[in-house]
Each structure stands twice: as structure tokens, then as C-alpha cells.
Amino acid sequence: MAGALRKMAVYLGLVEDDRYDHRYADEYDDFEDFDEPLDERPSRNRSPRDDSRNNAVTDSSDHSPSRNERRSPAPAPATADLARITTLHPRTYNEARTIGEHFREGIPVIMNLTEMVDSDAKRLVDFAAGLIFGLHGSIERVTNKVFLLSPANVEVTAEDKARIAERGFFNQS
């Protein structure tokens, strides 16, 4: 019974585990700096099997980006016509993919969430915020539950908003 109580006390951190083996304490002192390129790292002693596998990876790595290289999203079209603004009226969160696809193509999206349940609308706004962050766009609240998502290469000015409002895009609340 005392063994079970001792194990519980060790688990809760109330006492130290006496069974700690100090022979292995210095095993993790050497660390690899992952910021250095692979060629500059000190090589370890490897078995021939590991070396052959490493050579195969090295040969194919000439065409692939390195692990430390940052990837940027695919560039959107250079110019986006404001006449291509897409207005979507999602009813469920499952329609988030459509919003993402249009936005990723560089098309400004007006999200009208008035027909959605509040919990799903909040999830969709969170999705849109992640989309905006990931693709360097901007999001504006037009009215209650209506949002304009603009890609990075598109700037919607007040004049453009007025022109869009005349056509009825913003008057959907």
C-alpha cells in the first residue's frame, strides 16, 4: 500500500522519485542547432545503412525546398477588378471552403452571415480571420454579420464601397 501512495506522491510532484538514474543525466547536453544549414552541422557516426539512406535523400533534395526555408502563399493575380467581388450567403460552416477558394484566387468576398446560427457565424468569422492572416489580406465589418474580405493585392476605398453600396451589395442586413 505504501508503494501505491509513494507512486501517487511522485506523480503529483509532492516528492522526488528516488529511482532516477543519474547515469543518463548528461545524455542530452549535446544539441543540434536547427538554424544552421545541414552542411554546416557536425556529422555523427552513422552506420553504412544510414549513410546510404542519407545519400538518397541528398540527391533528391536538390529540387525540393529546405526544411528551414519559409514558404509564402501562392501569389494572387496582380490586379483584381472590383466587379469580380463575390457575395456569399453561407448557411452552415461547411460552406467555409467556398469562401476560402474565392479569397485564395484573389477575389474580394462579401460574407453575409445573417442567415446563420450565431455559433456557426462565430466559427466562420474565426475561419475568415485565419484566412486573412495567412494570406495577408484584410477584413472589414460592413454591418452586423456582414464582412468584406479583401486580398492583399486589393484595396477597397471608400469610393469603391459607395459604388458597391449603390448596387446593393452592402444593403443586405
UniProtKB/Swiss-Prot annotation:
Function: Cell division protein that is part of the divisome complex and is recruited early to the Z-ring. Probably stimulates Z-ring formation, perhaps through the cross-linking of FtsZ protofilaments. Its function overlaps with FtsA.
Subunit structure: Homodimer. Interacts with FtsZ.
Record has Cell division as a keyword: yes
Superkingdom assignment: Bacteria
Localization (cell): Cytoplasm
Gene Ontology biological process: division septum assembly; FtsZ-dependent cytokinesis
Keyword hit for Transit peptide: no
Alphabetical UniProt keywords: Cell cycle, Cell division, Cytoplasm, Septation
Sequence ranges of Basic and acidic residues compositional bias: 39-53, 60-72
Organism: Thermobifida fusca (strain YX)
Family of the protein in this entry: Belongs to the SepF family.
Main subcellular location of this protein, as a coarse class: cytoplasm
A GO CC term attached to the entry: cytoplasm
Stored Pfam families: SepF (PF04472)
Annotated stretches, region: Disordered: 31-82
Record's protein name: Cell division protein SepF
